[in-house]
């Protein structure tokens, strides 16, 4: 049973993201490189926030429950702000790199657009964030032990998997909206991305009341998905044509001779 829980939660958490990687990124070496670089930037932000957290915990009063809870909130907020700061830094780096690629290219168009870079880097952020948030939980799911034996929630593992899935997809959508906001200098949109990231992270404080964190998180996920779709140039008409297989440009672009 523990093996079934492990694989089930793993596929829930990482299945959609791995599918996106395999179908849209894996065949393009340049996209793979940018995805790995995005994951590295997220990892550096985690390293810095962990360092600050370690220092503050050492100098704090460990016997004060109120102070420790305040430090936990501070750590979450600091981590989110550092992640978004590194997302902006990665945007600036990609902007310079794209200009360099254009200068070296023999064509008049960029080898990869900023919208594609936003999607790829966001997925890189999401992969690394999801891995660090759920790997230890998945390891514990293999046993030994019985979930909920001491009266705790029996939905701990599956709830964690669905939260990880939401975080991975949200990072992808946040990346698209964030980069588009930087391109168009819409600072209110940047603020909305940071605010929604803070809200989602702080919602985890209501656990183990998982319905109190999962439901609002997936509502935010739905809103950000629509926003990212519009930022990527999508429309209701395009969606309808794609679903009904009437978008001739899309079909021709994806046609492969047999």
From Swiss-Prot:
It is found in: Membrane. GO terms for molecular function: protein-macromolecule adaptor activity. The keyword Transmembrane applies. It is a multi-pass membrane protein. Keywords: Membrane, Notch signaling pathway, Transmembrane, Transmembrane helix. GO terms for biological process: Notch receptor processing; Notch signaling pathway; protein processing. The chain crosses the membrane at residues 3-23, 32-52, 70-90, 118-138, 161-181, 187-207, 214-234. The keyword Magnesium does not apply. It comes from the Eukaryota. One of its GO terms (cellular component) is gamma-secretase complex. Essential subunit of the gamma-secretase complex, an endoprotease complex that catalyzes the intramembrane cleavage of integral proteins such as Notch receptors. It may represent a stabilizing cofactor for the presenilin homodimer that promotes the formation of a stable complex. Belongs to the APH-1 family. Component of the gamma-secretase complex, a complex composed of a presenilin homodimer (PSEN1 or PSEN2), nicastrin (NCSTN), APH1 and PEN2. This is Gamma-secretase subunit Aph-1b. It comes from Danio rerio (Zebrafish). The gene is aph1b.
